[in-house]
Structure formats: structure tokens, C-alpha cells
């Protein structure tokens, strides 16, 4: 790394909604500072996963150090790229804590969107210097002046220094680099000399183990230091090397000093040993107080993952273990189901997190899997005063011992064009939402604030919102509190046998509609047998919906040409008895498609 001058360091992040051009602007900054040679340049350089490139999203934070010459001085610009999605908001908050400034990228045609709003508020809470960037000014629909006013009126940011740019053509990129140097303050000179470094991410490397990404707040960290983690108060480790992102992770001589961003390796083997937001300090001269803001990341929803072919169980176990190496938020627990066999109960931070894990298992490990419907964590208060937390219908206790149940709620902000207001209000009403306030974002768009049960969000809220707003609506949510709710267990019985994979926890008002839709769906996907198959939805053993798969008919009188009717009656009677016996002892085989179809139900 080049000469160290604290006043020449700039640590910044990029805040943007999906598809507003964050990764493309990062590419242009890397090009303009010659961090990457032209022949090595490719689109979305910092997005290393194929999934990130295809979806146009950032899943893992990717830091990079750039050197920029300005007015005869060389500045070290540390970009700490962050995931934009609400599922990863804790990681975003830690990454922003490692910065002094942020670039707020807004599409000059689309304007401010919900996810960028959520992250701007996180940045404002940390008192970061925010530079608004109006991207995609080359588009015919771009209206930079209108978007400037939107940012000023709704977010309350001064847009005097806002920069209009086009990441596609490169226009305005040099102005962005100048603004980073001029407007974002350098790191403050630390008052302490003891090492304090904020962990904002970690990565598993098969050769060196865990690489811990840090921003050094005070002191320095170098090879040979013995370090410990303050919040988790675990063992101590010897630092085997320190490095920087140039743009690839590269080991360096010397140390990482106050204000700098880099990583260290220390013979750590599990990501779970390294907690995002924790403080690193040395054992010899340890800091007295850790950095503020650390909290454990806990999953907010769960789903079962099962291999379609039971012989793939060990391969699935291996796949999940490997994914967990780079994803400390993913929790895994072995479970078994009568219908689906052996599988895993996995915990996720949200729907996007869940989708990403599923897709990676299928793509990277070439496995066919079935996932049960996602479930949130319910609080069950029993009559004896005890409290249980359950995320699986199989753990639902006997209703006679339940005092009441509580479900998690979330605060939701929805940004939408005005003409879709009534459709969104109907959607939120259907999802048991409570309207808090409605504000004008500009002449044509509104911001709606709602409280909604998390269970209603995880099913299909995003799809329905996109559907009723023709793709123009966007939303973000943050976890709220637990509230009392009439939550019950809905069981599905096939041929009078309960099938655990189809049972779910639902609100009483939605139970009948949900039960009916599952029964109707199963009639279409379970093949006919030689006997009638009843499909029933039941609550507390009381049937609330029923469909019947008709028996395959066999003409047993086909060989009787004319003759006495009693002969035919005898054959029909014999067939009837046989079908009755088959119904008693016959097993209904449920195809895998049935499980997949039921998951598609709202």
C-alpha cells in the first residue's frame, strides 16, 4: 500500500435501489482510477456471483481500495460496497458505520425508491456526508431537476452538490471522484492508541480460512499480533497476515492503521466465530470499551429443504454446510418429515435471502430440492405462564393448553404512483394491514406507511404489489413488535391421513380460503386410484374444506352380454366390497409436483 496519510483517506459507501446503476458506477470509478487494467475490466466487477450479475443485485459486500491523484496529492479511496436489500439491513448498517460518507445513486428517470430511502435513513442516523448522484441522464425519460426536488423535499438533503452523470457513457464520473475528495471528510484522528477495528464482513477462503474484513478505528493491526473479539469474548488468535483490496484481496507488508480498510487472516475456520459488528482488539493492549451497535443476527423466517431423491441427503448436507461457510446468518438443523423424508430446517433473514440460498443449491451443487412454505416465528403463551417460540407447524402444542398466540409485525413503506393508491390499500387491507400515514413524494407519487403481519409479507406480497402497480411500486420493511393474533394450525388429510408437509400455521380469518385452495390444487395433481380419495382441510379435527378425487372406473360387466340383471348386480357388489377394502388398506402415493404446487398457493 502507498504512503499513509490519515487526512488523505476517504471511506465511502454507495446507496442505491436495485437497478439504479450502483455496480456500473463502481466499475467506472475503478476504471477512472486505473485500479483495474482495461483488459481485465468486465461489467459488475465487484459482483462476483453469477446470481448477482443476473439479478443486478449485490448479495455480499465487496470492498475495494482505489488511489486517486488530485491537486498534486494521492488519495486513498476505500469503497465499501453494500447489499442494497432490506434483508441485509444489519450488514448495511455495519458497513455504513465503517464510512464517513456515502454516494446516494438515484435513477434520473425513476426517482427515489423505497429501498434507497431505507438505507439513506441508516446513513443519516450515522451522520454520514451524503452526495446525491443522478444517474442515467442519457435516458430520454431522465428528468434530473425533478429528481433533485424530490430528494430535497422528501429526504431533506441539500442537492447543491448533486452530480448528474451517466455510468453508461462515463459522463460525470470525474466530478464524482472530485466530490468524494472535497466533500467526504477524512477519518477522525483517534484519541486512543489501543487497537479497535470494526468487523463489517467475512469471507471463507479454502486455502487460508476465514478472511475478516475490518475498518481500523484506532491503533494498528499487523502480522504476529494476538487479537481477540470483544463482543463475543472468545479465544485469542494470532494474526497470520494483513491485506488490502487492490481490487483483489492481496496480502501486504506492514500494518493496517487507523482509518484504513482491509482484512486479516488468523487461522479461523468457521464464519460463525466471526460476528459482523464485533470489535477486534489486541490481547496485550486491549481496548476498554467495544464499538457501539453490535447485535447478534437472528433468522426471521424458516423453511424446510428436502432432497427430491432421498439418496441426495448427504450431498444436500454438504451443500448447506459449504454455503454456511460464507453466510453466518444461515442456520441449519436436521429434521424429518413423514411425507418428505430427511431434510433440514433452515433459518433466513428474509425472502430474498431464502431465494438466493435455494437458487445456489440448485445451480452450484446441481441438486433437485423441495422447499416447504416459509414460516415466521410465532410466540405461544401457555396457560401455565410459559412462553414458546415456534416456527414449524409440527411444534404447535395442544390448543387446550394455549392462552394466546402472538405474531411478528413489520413497518412497511410503499412508494407508488398515485393512480394505484386504491389497489394498494385493498391489497394491504386483505393482508390485515394497518395504515399509519400517506405522504406525497412529488406530484405523481406517494409514500404509504403501513404496519403488516410478517407472515403476510413472506408469502406473495411483493408479487401482488408489482402486479397491482404494473411494476412501478416498491417497498421496504423493518421488523416491529409481536402482537396478539388468532393463529391456528391448518391440517391437510389425504385419505383420512394427515400429511405433515402440507400443514401450516395461518390466521383464523384466512384458514378456510387457504384450506380450500390447497384441497382444490391437490385434486388436480394427485393421480386417480381405483378407490375414492377424500382430501380434507381441518382445524382441531374439524373439517372446514373437502374435495374428492373420483375413483378410476372399471367396467366389470363388460363380458355380460344380455342375461339376468342379478348377475351384473353381483359383480357390482363384489367390486364395491373390493374398493372398500382398498380404501382401508390402500396407500395414496403423493407425487413431488403436489408439494411444489401447494407452495405456489398464496
Swiss-Prot record:
GO terms for biological process: positive regulation of translation. It is found in: Cell inner membrane. Its EC number is 3.6.5.n1. Residues 7-188 form the tr-type G domain. GTP binds at residues 19-24, 135-138. Keywords: Cell inner membrane, Cell membrane, GTP-binding, Hydrolase, Membrane, Nucleotide-binding, Protein biosynthesis. InterPro entries: EF-4, EFG_III/V, EFG_V-like, EFTu-like_2, LepA_C_sf, LepA_CTD, LepA_IV, P-loop_NTPase. One of its GO terms (cellular component) is plasma membrane. Pfam families: EFG_C, GTP_EFTU, GTP_EFTU_D2, LepA_C. It is a peripheral membrane protein. One of its GO terms (molecular function) is GTP binding. It is an enzyme of class 3 (hydrolase). Its main location: membrane. It catalyses: GTP + H2O = GDP + phosphate + H(+). The keyword 4Fe-4S does not apply. NCBIfam families: lepA (TIGR01393), small_GTP (TIGR00231). Belongs to the TRAFAC class translation factor GTPase superfamily. Classic translation factor GTPase family. LepA subfamily. Required for accurate and efficient protein synthesis under certain stress conditions. May act as a fidelity factor of the translation reaction, by catalyzing a one-codon backward translocation of tRNAs on improperly translocated ribosomes. Back-translocation proceeds from a post-translocation (POST) complex to a pre-translocation (PRE) complex, thus giving elongation factor G a second chance to translocate the tRNAs correctly. Binds to ribosomes in a GTP-dependent manner. PANTHER family: TRANSLATION FACTOR GUF1 HOMOLOG, CHLOROPLASTIC, TRANSLATION FACTOR GUF1-RELATED. This is Elongation factor 4. The lineage of its organism: Bacteria, Pseudomonadati, Chlamydiota, Chlamydiia, Chlamydiales.
Amino acid at each position: 500500500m502507498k504512503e499513509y496519510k490519515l487526512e488523505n483517506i476517504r471511506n465511502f459507501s454507495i446507496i442505491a435501489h436495485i437497478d439504479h446503476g450502483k455496480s456500473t458506477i463502481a466499475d467506472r470509478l475503478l476504471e477512472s482510477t486505473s485500479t483495474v487494467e482495461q483488459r481485465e475490466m468486465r461489467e459488475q466487477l465487484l459482483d462476483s456471483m453469477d446470481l448477482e450479475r443476473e439479478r443486478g443485485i449485490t448479495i455480499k459486500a465487496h470492498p475495494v481500495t482505489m488511489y486517486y491523484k488530485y491537486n498534486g496529492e494521492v488519495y486513498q479511496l476505500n469503497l465499501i460496497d453494500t447489499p442494497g436489500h432490506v434483508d441485509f439491513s444489519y450488514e448495511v448498517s455495519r458497513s455504513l458505520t465503517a464510512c464517513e460518507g456515502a454516494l446516494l445513486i438515484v435513477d434520473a428517470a425513476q426517482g427515489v425508491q423505497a429501498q434507497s430511502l431505507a438505507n439513506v435513513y441508516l446513513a443519516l442516523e450515522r451522520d454520514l456526508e451524503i452526495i446525491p448522484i443522478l444517474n442515467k441522464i442519457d435516458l430520454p425519460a431522465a428528468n434530473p431537476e425533478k429528481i433533485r426536488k424530490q430528494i430535497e423535499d422528501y429526504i431533506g438533503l441539500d442537492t447543491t452538490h448533486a452530480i448528474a452523470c451517466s455510468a453508461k457513457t462515463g459522463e460525470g464520473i470525474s466530478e464524482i471522484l472530485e466530490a468524494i475528495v472535497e466533500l467526504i471528510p477524512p477519518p477522525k484522528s483517534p484519541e486512543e492508541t489501543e487497537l479497535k477495528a470494526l468487523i463489517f464482513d467475512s469471507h471463507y477462503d479454502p486455502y487460508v480460512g476465514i478472511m475478516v474484513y475490518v475498518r481500523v478505528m484506532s491503533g494498528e493491526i499487523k502480522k504476529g499480533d494476538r487479537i481477540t473479539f470483544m463482543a463475543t469474548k472468545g479465544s485469542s488468535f494470532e494474526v497470520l497476515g494483513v491485506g488490502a483490496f487492490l481490487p483483489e484481496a492481496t496480502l501486504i507488508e506492514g500494518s493496517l492503521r487507523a482509518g484504513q480498510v482491509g482484512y486479516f487472516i488468523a487461522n479461523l475456520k468457521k464464519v460463525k466465530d466471526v460476528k459482523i459488528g464485533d470489535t477486534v482488539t489486541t490481547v496485550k493492549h486491549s481496548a476498554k470499551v467495544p464499538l457501539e451497535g453490535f447485535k447478534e443476527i437472528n433468522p426471521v423466517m424458516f423453511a424446510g429443504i428436502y432432497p427430491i431423491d432421498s439418496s441426495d441427503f448427504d450431498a444436500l448436507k454438504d451443500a448447506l454446510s459449504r454455503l454456511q461457510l460464507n453466510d453466518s446468518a444461515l442456520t441449519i438443523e436436521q429434521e424429518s418429515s413423514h411425507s418428505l423424508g430427511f431434510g433440514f430446517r433452515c433459518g433466513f433473514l428474509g425472502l430474498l435471502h431464502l431465494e438466493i440460498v435455494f437458487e445456489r443449491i440448485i445451480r452450484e451443487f446441481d441438486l433437485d430440492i423441495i422447499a416447504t412454505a416459509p414460516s415466521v416465528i410465532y410466540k405461544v403463551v401457555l396457560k401455565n405462564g410459559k412462553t414458546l417460540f415456534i416456527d414449524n407447524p409440527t411444534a404447535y402444542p395442544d390448543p387446550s393448553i394455549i392462552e394466546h398466540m402472538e405474531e411478528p409485525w413489520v413497518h412497511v413503506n410503499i412508494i407508488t404512483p398515485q393512480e394505484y393508491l386504491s389497489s394498494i390499500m385493498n391489497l394491504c387491507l386483505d393482508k390485515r394491514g394497518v395504515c399509519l400515514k400517506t405522504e406525497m413524494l412529488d406530484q405523481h407519487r406517494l409514500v404509504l406507511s403501513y404496519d403488516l403481519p410478517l407472515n403476510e409479507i413472506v408469502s406473495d406480497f411483493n408479487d401482488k404489489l408489482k402486479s397491482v402497480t404494473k411494476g412501478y411500486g416498491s417497498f421496504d420493511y423493518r421488523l416491529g413488535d409481536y402482537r396478539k393474533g388468532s393463529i391456528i394450525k391448518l391440517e391437510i388429510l389425504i385419505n383420512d391421513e394427515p400429511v405433515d408437509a402440507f400443514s401450516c400455521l395461518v390466521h383464523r380469518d384466512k384458514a378456510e380460503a387457504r384450506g380450500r385452495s390447497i384441497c382444490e390444487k391437490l385434486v388436480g395433481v394427485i393421480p386417480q386410484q381405483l378407490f375414492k380419495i377424500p382430501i380434507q382441510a381441518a382445524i382441531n379435527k374439524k373439517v372446514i374444506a373437502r374435495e374428492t378425487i373420483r375413483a378410476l372406473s372399471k367396467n366389470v360387466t363388460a363380458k355380460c352380454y344380455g342375461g339376468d340383471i342379478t348377475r351384473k348386480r353381483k359383480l357390482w357388489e363384489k367390486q364395491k366390497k373390493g374398493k372398500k377394502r382398498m380404501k382401508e388398506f390402500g396407500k395414496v402415493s403423493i407425487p413431488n409436483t403436489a408439494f411444489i404446487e401447494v407452495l405456489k398457493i398464496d
